[in-house]
């Protein structure tokens, strides 16, 4: 039996007992959170002005502190970072327009400065950075985004969107390049998505089928998905967990039909999969907190398992913070007082701003830098710099060694295409939302990705597996 116990003090959540340890929360007399603890150890605390005033400081148990100052209208003005054992330094500076909207912000650690413009309805319309990178939004009378423009300071990319009378996206358009069209059934479920060139020729399509309605039930989960080279069929249990996936190659293919089946416990945790795609049967076991504690692999079978697995991996967890993994299959892990991983085998991790990854060193050193929102804007690996250009939460483009890789999204912030060296490649996803293929603008599948049930990449195949397959970061 699994249970979480919640305790309250004056109607405020004071603790959560889970897996044999506690998460604790403390408050001041005004209800502001003053500290959070895990397994009896304080991991973060907050300081405020007197009499229910503004937040002044966030203090992390690993020694990092962030201090906040405000303008005369109580808006963030400047924040400061004091790393553990170091002196305080300026972190972010904020400037506002006369309407009170943020119009300029600078992150002093990464050197990023953004200027923000708004339309007459105070909707964010344009953002520019110090290097000339810019993105813009255009809206229609229904407050729907109909255009997104992005430039890296040299080239530019414009994506247009159209909608039906119910506000559902009908088309994503890249002027002069391609259009992705979406069809729906009378219940609003997606039934087809197709990519077509500017001349109207269809280069790729994906179709979806759903189980027939029964006993006044309609199903939102597809029972079949047909893509370029194969179709996938799905079965589910009453909780919506996938119990079977069958991959059927199209007629004329030399590939086999592959079927994977899945079993779950009463907590909807995957406990066994019989995987023809991996040619093995895998059994999973968990502790009372839902943490994976062992993985056993056997030769593929749908029947009774032999006593001894072909391969087994096990994990151990902290005796106090019982969700904290200390060792997996012989690889040890250590953490700081906040719970950030410090080492994993021979790999060393360092952190900044309390919870932001600053560096990974495993023989090659990778450093990371962030903007005021916490988005990663730069990576340096052994001296090679990659700059990431964000449009809100979306990675719009990245530049490295003089080249730019672009990303195209639909109006729901889902990836549609990637542009590498001026060539377009369309993303193909399965029902689990894994990116399983890249298709070029002629309709040819050039990269295939295979994952395990946890989303770990198992293989990359296809004619461009060693170039585009590796360059695409979304896999």
PLM feature segments, named:
Residues 8, 28, 38, 49-50, ...:
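Short, acidic, Ser/Thr-enriched surface-loop or helix-capping motifs
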Residues 1-6, 15-23, 35-41, 56-66, ...:
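Beta-turn initiation residues at beta-strand->coil junctions
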Residues 24-35, 45-47, 57, 67-75, ...:
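Tandem repeat domain/solenoid detector
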Residues 282-319, 391-394:
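Structured, non-catalytic alpha/beta "coupling" segments that mediate domain-domain communication
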Residues 42, 311-332, 336:
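Extended, small-residue-rich solenoid/repeat segments and analogous flexible loops
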Residues 4-6, 25, 46-47, 68, ...:
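A residue-level detector for well-ordered beta-strand positions
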């Amino acid at each position: 039996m699994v249970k979480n116990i919640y305790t309250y003090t004056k109607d405020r959540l004071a603790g959560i007992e889970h897996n044999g340890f506690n998460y604790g929360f403390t408050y001041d007399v005004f209800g502001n959170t003053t500290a959070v603890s895990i397994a009896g150890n304080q991991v973060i605390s907050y300081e405020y002005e007197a009499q229910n005033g503004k937040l002044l400081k966030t203090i992390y148990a690993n020694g990092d502190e962030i201090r906040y100052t405000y303008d005369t209208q109580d808006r963030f003005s400047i924040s400061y970072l004091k790393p553990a054992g170091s002196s305080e330094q300026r972190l972010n500076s904020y400037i506002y327009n006369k309407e009170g909207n943020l119009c300029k912000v600078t992150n002093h650690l990464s050197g990023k400065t953004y200027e923000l413009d708004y339309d007459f309805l105070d909707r964010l319309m344009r953002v520019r950075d110090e290097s000339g990178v810019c993105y813009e939004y255009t809206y229609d009378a229904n407050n729907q985004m109909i255009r997104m423009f992005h430039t890296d300071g040299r080239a530019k990319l414009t994506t247009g969107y159209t909608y039906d009378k119910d506000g559902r996206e009908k088309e994503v358009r890249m002027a002069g390049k391609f259009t992705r069209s979406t069809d729906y059934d009378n219940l609003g479920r997606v039934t087809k998505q197709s990519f077509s060139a500017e001349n109207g020729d269809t280069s790729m399509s994906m179709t979806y089928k759903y189980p027939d309605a029964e006993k006044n039930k309609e199903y939102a989960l597809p029972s079949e998905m047909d893509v370029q080279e194969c179709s996938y069929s799905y079965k589910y249990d009453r909780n919506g967990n996938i119990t079977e996936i069958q991959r059927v190659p199209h007629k004329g293919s030399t590939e086999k039909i592959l079927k994977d089946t899945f079993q779950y416990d009463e907590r909807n945790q995957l406990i066994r999969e019989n995987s023809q795609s991996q040619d093995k049967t895998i059994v999973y076991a968990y502790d009372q907190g839902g943490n994976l504690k062992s993985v056993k692999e056997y030769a593929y079978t749908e029947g009774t398992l032999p006593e001894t697995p072909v391969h087994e991996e096990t994990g151990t967890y902290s005796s106090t913070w019982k969700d904290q993994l200390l060792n997996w299959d012989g690889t040890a892990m250590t953490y700081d007082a906040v719970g950030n991983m410090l080492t994993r085998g021979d790999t060393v991790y360092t952190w900044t701003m309390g919870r932001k990854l600053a560096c990974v060193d495993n023989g090659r050193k990778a450093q990371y830098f962030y903007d005021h929102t916490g988005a990663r804007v730069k990576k340096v690996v052994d001296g090679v710099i990659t700059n990431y250009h964000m449009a809100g939460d979306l990675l719009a483009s990245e530049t490295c060694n003089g080249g730019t890789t672009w990303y195209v999204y639909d109006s729901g912030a889902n990836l549609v295409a990637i542009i590498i060296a001026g060539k377009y490649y369309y993303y193909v996803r399965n029902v689990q939302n894994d990116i399983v293929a890249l298709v070029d603008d002629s309709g040819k599948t050039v990269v295939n990705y295979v994952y395990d049930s946890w989303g770990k990449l198992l293989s990359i195949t296809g004619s461009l597996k060693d170039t585009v397959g590796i360059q695409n970061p979304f896999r």
